[in-house]
Regions:
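Active-site neighborhood of divalent metal-dependent phosphoester bond hydrolases
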Residues: 1-91
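Acidic, His/Gly-enriched loop-helix segments that form or flank divalent-metal centers
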Residues: 36, 62-166, 172-176, 193-199, ...
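Short acidic-glycine loop/turn motifs at beta-strand connectors
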Residues: 95-97, 161, 184-189, 242
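SH3/SH3-like (including bacterial SH3b) beta-barrel domains
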Residues: 209-221, 257-285
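SH3/SH3-like beta-barrel superfamily modules
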Residues: 221-250, 274-305
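Short, basic/aromatic beta-hairpin or loop at an interaction surface
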Residues: 196-207, 243-260
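C-terminal functional module detector
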Residues: 178, 185-222
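A structural signal for short hydrophobic beta-strand segments in well-ordered beta-sheet cores
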Residues: 92-93, 183, 228
Length: 305
């Protein structure tokens, strides 16, 4: 998933996907020199007349098109073998009790999905929120699991037991507190799961006890608009547009000013912490630190070492 953090990043992504309207087709695969199914690679050989999207009047300049085509050629020269290998992989991995897919599945009848556009299985937004139920466990990524949690931000795997779906996307690369999740199946014949997680955040030791807060809000991508009420000591006091909740956030979490502003995932949740707990530091401010403990992100107002 791509998080729209800046106009430059968003424009670059749209331009990269401009050809063929962002569709993944056989012509796109052939243009990249790849073989095999599924056709999962966009054609980056762009036409200067291509539009950024259906609602935009901004055309690609000749310089932009030339730069993108040069980038495409360099990527293919450097990683052609890797891209061919990726294109040869199955879209769905099937076992007796599990189905593994990047985005999601409409149902378990894989035979009936033969010949469909694999992109729909790769980009399946809000898969768990679709309230589908399966007999086998579906393990999916793509949609960061913190987006399923409206009160407390947590990047640990999300197990929707009644639906038999496990979301494992920890937001690595698109969330400031993102992490890489590894799901472990100790016994594939049992409904028993473990996981390990890793991130690149610095580790600190908490020195003071802190009780967890009981009422909190988690501002997430897609619902990330806030009015900035004031700024103070590297923080901003904001009002979340959709809920009306007010909270302090690190000022650096504002990635686009405006009325309203757009902010990174944020929360007013205070983590329960004991002295000696190891936490991961997301952001430090004079008001406190945003840290992560066991995959859960929140504020810590004690001392860190």
């Amino acid at each position: 998933m791509f998080q729209d953090r800046s106009p430059r990043a968003n424009t670059a992504l749209r331009r990269a996907l401009a050809a063929e309207g962002g569709r993944f087709a056989k012509e796109a695969r052939d243009a990249l020199g790849l073989s095999g199914e599924p056709a999962l690679h966009p054609d980056l050989r762009v036409d200067p007349a291509a539009r950024l999207d259906a609602s935009s009047d901004e055309p690609l300049s000749e310089d932009d098109a030339e730069a993108l085509n040069d980038f495409r050629d360099r990527v293919l020269d450097a990683y052609g073998a890797e891209l061919s290998w990726l294109a040869s992989l199955p879209t769905v991995v099937e076992t007796e009790r599990f189905l593994f897919v990047h985005g999601g599945l409409p149902h378990e009848d894989l035979a009936s999905l033969s010949g469909t556009n694999a992109f729909a299985l790769m980009k399946n937004d809000r898969f768990i929120d679709q309230r589908l139920h399966f007999s086998r466990w579906i393990v999916a990524g793509h949609w960061p699991v913190s987006l399923y949690r409206p009160e407390i931000p947590c990047a640990a795997p999300y197990i929707a037991a009644s639906q038999r779906i496990i979301g494992i996307d920890g937001g690595c690369g698109v969330k400031l507190d993102g992490q890489l999740n590894a799901l472990i199946l100790p016994d594939a014949s049992e409904d028993r799961f473990e996981f390990r997680m890793a991130d690149a955040l610095p580790e600190r030791t908490a020195l003071d006890r802190q009780e967890g807060s009981r009422d909190s809000v988690s501002i997430r991508w897609g619902d990330h608009y806030a009015d900035i009420l004031r700024r103070e000591d590297g923080c901003a006091y904001v009002r979340h547009v959709s809920t009306g909740r007010t909270l302090w956030i690190p000022e650096s979490f504002i990635f686009r000013d405006g009325s309203p502003a757009q902010i990174e995932d944020a929360t007013d949740y205070a983590l329960p912490v004991e002295p000696g707990d190891r936490v991961r530091l997301v952001a430090s401010t004079p008001r406190g630190a945003v840290v992560k403990k066991n995959g859960v992100t929140g504020w810590y107002y004690g001392r860190l070492q």
